[in-house]
Swiss-Prot record:
Protein name (database record): Inner membrane-spanning protein YciB
Transmembrane stretches, start-end: 22-42, 50-70, 80-100, 122-142, 148-168
Listed PANTHER family: INNER MEMBRANE-SPANNING PROTEIN YCIB (PTHR36917:SF1), INTRACELLULAR SEPTATION PROTEIN A-RELATED (PTHR36917)
InterPro entries: YciB
Family: Belongs to the YciB family.
Function: Plays a role in cell envelope biogenesis, maintenance of cell envelope integrity and membrane homeostasis.
CC per GO annotation: plasma membrane
Compartments, as annotated in UniProt: Cell inner membrane
Chief place where the protein resides: membrane
Amino acid sequence: MKQILDFIPLIIFFALYKMYDIYTATGALIIATAIQLVVTYALYKKVEKMQLITFIMVTVFGGMTIFLHDDNFIKWKVTIVYCVFAAGLIIAHILGKPVIKGMLGKEVTLPDDKWTKINHAWVLFFTVCAIANLYVAFEMPLDVWVNFKVFGLLGLTFLYTLFTGMYVYKHMPKEKKEEQE
């Protein structure tokens, strides 16, 4: 349910972009993301930092897109969010507070070096996505960027999450694997 809530604003953005324009879609994205936060809090009594960061970025860059009537701001938002996530993982690692281990460590037991590899892999993933977004956003037509943002980046994230899960499963202690099966 929680994952579905995360995708609703993106689906609304895509639908309204196709029906109207980038500015209508951006306004709807801001509203849908705000509603998503409220619903998430009402259901789970908690909002994750990633959701909050995304909401702030959507509101700031989406607001600038609408107010200045310039779609470059919403395009930059995607790259900046990925850079913030990558930087957050790097800083947390330096401070000795591995974020991914904190998210999954209660359900999954792995050696610290494996958590570090996963952390570094996600830093690389977010960095590559940020660069790819810059290229597509500013070298391709707006329609291509919207499709890339909605389907390309979403698909890449899904696949990378799947590969991370396979890596985690491969390195889980044998008794934990048997519990999972």
